[in-house]
Amino acid sequence: MTQAKTFKVTLTKSLIGRKENHIASARGLGLRKINHTVEVLDTPENRGMANKIYYMVKIEG
């Protein structure tokens, strides 16, 4: 069987004072606190959310 492709996203900056839709994107990816890392499926939806908040996350993979 093939493994589903994933990528890691780490929240590097605070969500305080950010736009509501950017906070929603971070929460949608499962990010909660600064330096919290999650591994999500590499889908267009997840890539779009990560790209929307590129300035406050680190993307690996």
Swiss-Prot record:
InterPro entries: Ribo_uL30_ferredoxin-like_sf (IPR036919), Ribosomal_uL30_bac-type (IPR005996), Ribosomal_uL30_ferredoxin-like (IPR016082). GO terms for molecular function: structural constituent of ribosome. Pfam families: Ribosomal_L30 (PF00327). The keyword Ribonucleoprotein applies. One of its GO terms (cellular component) is cytosolic large ribosomal subunit. Keywords: Ribonucleoprotein, Ribosomal protein. GO terms for biological process: translation. Signal peptide: none annotated. Transmembrane segments: none annotated. Part of the 50S ribosomal subunit. NCBIfam families: rpmD_bact. Belongs to the universal ribosomal protein uL30 family. HAMAP family: Ribosomal_uL30_B. This is Large ribosomal subunit protein uL30. It comes from Francisella philomiragia subsp. philomiragia (strain ATCC 25017 / CCUG 19701 / FSC 153 / O#319-036). The lineage of its organism: Bacteria, Pseudomonadati, Pseudomonadota, Gammaproteobacteria, Thiotrichales.
